[in-house]
Regions:
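Iron-sulfur cluster-binding cysteine motifs and their immediate structural context
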Residues: 13-38, 57-90, 136, 143, ...
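Feature captures the FAD/FMN-dependent oxidoreductase FAD-binding
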Residues: 106-107, 111-115, 163-213, 312-323, ...
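N-terminal Rossmann-like FAD-binding beta1-loop-alpha1 element of flavoenzymes
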Residues: 111-136, 261-269
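Rossmann-like dinucleotide-binding cores of NAD(P)H-dependent redox enzymes
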Residues: 134-137, 141-172, 176, 265-312
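FAD-site-proximal beta/loop scaffold in flavoenzymes
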Residues: 217-249, 336-392
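A conserved FAD-binding loop/helix module that cradles the flavin
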Residues: 264, 385-400
Length: 400
């Protein structure tokens, strides 16, 4: 506590705080830090809650150096306020001490269905519940959380933290329907028929992209999201080690250089891979991953092949991948690998919109929405937000 207060006291409490401008959800950063500096933990948490329903999560996975912290006026001098750590401290303190007891309005403003319980769905559900709406989340998995639960590794985002944040959403009166696949078991029309006044689609981008090159169908070429999902449920004790698609001693390549690629590479290290190499067609400067994750990967022994554009995956006579061929600054080269993970992006699955009339999407399947009323689709009463609307970004961008 004393360390957190001391760090908070370094804040200059700027008149025009650039840190707030750097936050996609415009969190009241100087205000919560000011309360923390005085030891007013409850006030600090209440201020954070005004903008964020998932502070303990954002504090752990946000790219702070690109957002709030990177915009701090002290950052160029190497002395930027550790905003993420302060938010994490306050959120964890609140979880442990249960400081906040919100007075909730009666649920009299209508009935809203939220599809998906990732960052976007949880944020919308929490906000609406606080405003007096009766909210139900339809979730396809056995446990809520979406990408927070199944797509981000335990070492970066402990699942207990996710569960605690979801419990806070439940405490607002939000109901969860689990193992409920919208677009398969029921569609948008069915949900409206159940008496819902509005529907929010926050289903994210569940469909991973592949590479249109020879050998993409070889055995041993897998999606990074699948590796992360299986590793997460293995860590939970739900499946055995044999279900995780990286075998101890394998030489693993990861295609791509975003945060998912870093997560997959570091997970492969933890699964006992003999070597892990990230293959990226651009330079280190072009890398979209968070710098802290890149540095952590380096420290864990992950290697990097820059400006290496893969043209073919190589296989043996049994259809098993054995390596790749790529164009490099030194010419065409071949590299031997036992396993190749694809982390080259994802896009929305069509299951929800294809089973419902009147919801327009672009050519890539992203749901088209209006500015006014904000987030409304081409179908009246149906709204959408998060990664299903824009290309996959960070947790906090999905919340925005």
């Amino acid at each position: 506590l004393q360390e957190a207060i001391a760090e908070a006291k370094r804040c200059l409490n700027c008149k025009n705080p650039s840190c707030k401008k750097g936050c996609p959800i415009e969190n009241h950063i100087p205000e919560f830090i000011h309360e923390l500096s005085k030891g007013n933990m409850g006030n600090a948490m209440a201020i954070i809650n005004e903008k964020s329903n998932l502070p303990a999560i954002c504090a752990r996975v946000c790219p702070h150096e690109k957002q709030c912290q990177g915009h701090c006026v002290l950052y160029p001098k190497g002395k930027g306020i550790e905003i993420g750590k302060l938010e994490r401290f306050v959120a964890d303190f609140d979880t442990e001490m249960k400081l906040i007891r919100e007075k909730l309005p009666q649920k009299t403003r209508g009935k809203v269905a939220v599809i998906g319980s990732g960052p976007a769905g949880l944020t919308v559900a929490g906000d609406l519940a606080r405003q007096g709406f009766n909210v139900t989340i339809f979730e396809s998995q056995a446990e809520p959380g979406g990408v927070l639960m199944y797509g981000i590794p335990e070492y970066r985002l402990p699942k207990q933290v996710v569960r605690q944040e979801i419990e806070k959403i439940e405490a607002l009166g939000v109901t969860f329907l689990l193992n409920c696949v919208v677009g398969k078991q029921l569609n948008i029309d069915d949900i409206f028929a159940q008496g819902y006044d509005a529907i929010f689609i926050g289903s994210g981008t569940a469909l991973p992209k592949s590479l249109d090159i020879p050998g993409a169908g070889l055995r041993g070429v897998i999606q990074a999201t699948y590796l992360l999902h299986m590793a997460n449920i293995y860590n939970e004790g739900t499946v055995g080690r044999d279900k995780v698609p990286v075998i101890e001693g394998e030489h693993v390549a990861v295609m791509g250089c975003g945060n998912v690629a870093m997560d997959a590479a570091r997970t492969a290290v933890r699964m006992g891979a003999a070597s892990v190499t990230i293959v990226y067609r651009r330079t280190e400067a072009d890398m979209p991953a968070i710098q802290a994750e890149y540095q952590a990967a380096l420290q864990e022994g992950v290697k990097f092949l820059w400006q290496t554009s893969t043209t073919e995956f190589l296989g043996d006579e049994d259809g098993k991948v054995v390596g790749l061929r790529a164009n490099t600054p030194e010419g065409v080269k071949e590299y031997a690998f036992d396993r190749i993970c694809l982390a080259v992006g994802s896009r929305p699955a069509s299951r929800i919109v294809s089973t419902t009339e009147g919801i327009e999407t672009d050519d890539n399947g992203y749901v088209l929405v209006k500015e006014r009323p904000f987030g409304m689709t081409s179908r009246k009463g149906v709204f959408a937000g998060g990664d299903v609307v824009h290309r996959p970004q960070t947790v906090v961008m999905a919340m925005k």
